[in-house]
Amino acid sequence: MKGGAGVPDLPSLDASGVRLAIVASSWHGKICDALLDGARKVAAGCGLDDPTVVRVLGAIEIPVVAQELARNHDAVVALGVVIRGQTPHFDYVCDAVTQGLTRVSLDSSTPIANGVLTTNTEEQALDRAGLPTSAEDKGAQATVAALATALTLRELRAHS
């Protein structure tokens, strides 16, 4: 995978001992399953073979489940897909999910990585899903972001 413009190389992390949770929606199953596969591969590569995985129906349900998971996990990865339709519903869902995840992260002081794809077309989502034909793997990227942030917070808290 070549990655999108500006995407950094994903660092190799030892996240042993980090309690990781992944919440993934079920709409656009092929894409969400691929995002989840990418997240699980990164977790395993970072020393976490058994992250907590919770499936929800749609993207709008992700923030409340992420909030509950943040109570007893060091990092949460949110995965889903919202594809623009012909009504304003897309904008409302994307805004609600993004604001919800940000609020949960700040309120809980737990990294919540936003791997919810918000695209204009299904093709754009497929190109970011981590499939063999995809340019990017947003599930993997979100997982690295969550784990790296959890490790940074652990280090900062150890020195405060």
Curated annotation (Swiss-Prot):
Residues reported to bind 5-amino-6-(D-ribitylamino)uracil: 27, 59-61, 81-83, 114
Keywords per UniProt: Riboflavin biosynthesis, Transferase
Protein name per UniProt: 6,7-dimethyl-8-ribityllumazine synthase
Activity regulation information from UniProt: Activity is competitively inhibited by substituted ribitylpurinetrione compounds such as 3-(1,3,7,9-tetrahydro-9-D-ribityl-2,6,8-trioxopurin-7-yl)propane 1-phosphate, with inhibition constants in the 4-5 nM range.
Cross-referenced HAMAP family: Lumazine_synth
Similarity field: Belongs to the DMRL synthase family.
Entry's Gene Ontology molecular function annotations: 6,7-dimethyl-8-ribityllumazine synthase activity
Enzyme Commission number, as recorded: 2.5.1.78
Catalytic reaction equation(s): (2S)-2-hydroxy-3-oxobutyl phosphate + 5-amino-6-(D-ribitylamino)uracil = 6,7-dimethyl-8-(1-D-ribityl)lumazine + phosphate + 2 H2O + H(+)
Location of the active site: 89
Pathway: Cofactor biosynthesis; riboflavin biosynthesis; riboflavin from 2-hydroxy-3-oxobutyl phosphate and 5-amino-6-(D-ribitylamino)uracil: step 1/2
Chain's gene name: ribH
Keyword Coiled coil on entry: no
Further information: Was identified as a high-confidence drug target.
Pfam families: DMRL_synthase
Biological process per Gene Ontology, one example term: riboflavin biosynthetic process
Residues that hold (2S)-2-hydroxy-3-oxobutyl phosphate according to the record: 86-87, 128
Gene Ontology cellular component annotations, sorted alphabetically: cytoplasm; cytosol; riboflavin synthase complex
InterPro entries per record: LS, LS/RS, LS/RS_sf
Lineage: superkingdom: Bacteria
